[in-house]
C-alpha cells in the first residue's frame, strides 16, 4: 500500500486557496501566470570572522539548524585594507531554500520566529525590489526555536530574501499577505 506523501501546510493552502483567490483578484488567464514562491535565501554576514575563524563555524552551525540544510561559506571578493580583509577570506554563510523546505521555513518564520522578535511592529511593506522580491532583516537569530539560547556564543543578524515569480510589487505583496506576512499598514 502506498504511503501518503507529505505536503507542507502552506503549500497546500497556496494550491487550494491562495492561487484561485489571486487568479480572481488579478484576473489571470493561465494558472502559470499566478505568482508563486520561487526561493528563500538566508544570509548571515560575519564581519568578526576576519579576526577569529571560529565565529564562521558557529554561524555555519546556527544557520544549518535554522534552515535544515548545509549552508555555503561566502568569501570576500576583494581585499579591503581598512577592514584587514583579504580576497578569499570567509566573511559569511548563506543558504538557498526551495520547494518543501522553503514552505516549512516560511511557516516557522511567520508563525513562530516573527512573534518572538522584541518590539515587533510589523514588516515594512516597501521593502520590495520592484520585481516582486522581498528583503527583510532580523537583528537576532535566536528568535528561531531551533537555536538553543544557552548554547549560543554570539547573537548574529541575518538577511532573509523571499523571491517570487510576481511581475509587480503589488502582486508579490498580495501573495505574501496570503502567507500571513505581518506588513505594517
UniProtKB/Swiss-Prot annotation:
Pfam family for this entry, one: Ribosomal_L5_C
> Subunit info?
Part of the 50S ribosomal subunit; part of the 5S rRNA/L5/L18/L25 subcomplex. Contacts the 5S rRNA and the P site tRNA. Forms a bridge to the 30S subunit in the 70S ribosome.
Note the HAMAP family from the entry. Ribosomal_uL5_B
Per the UniProt entry, the disulfide pairs are none
Q: Which family does it belong to?
A: Belongs to the universal ribosomal protein uL5 family.
On the tree of life, the source organism's domain of life is Bacteria
Q: What name does UniProt use for this protein?
A: Large ribosomal subunit protein uL5
Q: Which GO terms describe its biological process?
A: translation
Any one annotated GO CC term: ribosome
Q: What does this protein do?
A: This is one of the proteins that bind and probably mediate the attachment of the 5S RNA into the large ribosomal subunit, where it forms part of the central protuberance. In the 70S ribosome it contacts protein S13 of the 30S subunit (bridge B1b), connecting the 2 subunits; this bridge is implicated in subunit movement. Contacts the P site tRNA; the 5S rRNA and some of its associated proteins might help stabilize positioning of ribosome-bound tRNAs.
User: What keywords would UniProt list here?
Assistant: Ribonucleoprotein, Ribosomal protein, RNA-binding, rRNA-binding, tRNA-binding
The keyword Ribonucleoprotein is annotated on this UniProt entry: yes
Give this protein's Gene Ontology molecular function annotations: rRNA binding; structural constituent of ribosome; tRNA binding
Q: Which InterPro entries match?
A: Ribosomal_uL5, Ribosomal_uL5_bac-type, Ribosomal_uL5_C, Ribosomal_uL5_CS, Ribosomal_uL5_dom_sf, Ribosomal_uL5_N
Keyword set includes Lyase: no
Amino acid at each position: 500500500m502506498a504511503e501518503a506523501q507529505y505536503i507542507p501546510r502552506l503549500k497546500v493552502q497556496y494550491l487550494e486557496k491562495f492561487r484561485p483567490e489571486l487568479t480572481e483578484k488579478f484576473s489571470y488567464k493561465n494558472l502559470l501566470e499566478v505568482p508563486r514562491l520561487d526561493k528563500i535565501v538566508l544570509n548571515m554576514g560575519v564581519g568578526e570572522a576576519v579576526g577569529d575563524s571560529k565565529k564562521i563555524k558557529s554561524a555555519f552551525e546556527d544557520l544549518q539548524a535554522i534552515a535544515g540544510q548545509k549552508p555555503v561559506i561566502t568569501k570576500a571578493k576583494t581585499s579591503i585594507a581598512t577592514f584587514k580583509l583579504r580576497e578569499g577570506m570567509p566573511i559569511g554563510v548563506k543558504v538557498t531554500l526551495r520547494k518543501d523546505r522553503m514552505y516549512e521555513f516560511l511557516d516557522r518564520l511567520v508563525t513562530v520566529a516573527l512573534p518572538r522578535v522584541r518590539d515587533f511592529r510589523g514588516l515594512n511593506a516597501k521593502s520590495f525590489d520592484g520585481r516582486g522580491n522581498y528583503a527583510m532583516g532580523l537583528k537576532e537569530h535566536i528568535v528561531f526555536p531551533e537555536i538553543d539560547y544557552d548554547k549560543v556564543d554570539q547573537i548574529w543578524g541575518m538577511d532573509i530574501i523571499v523571491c517570487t515569480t510576481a511581475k509587480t510589487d503589488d502582486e508579490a505583496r498580495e501573495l505574501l499577505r496570503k502567507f500571513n506576512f505581518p506588513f505594517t499598514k
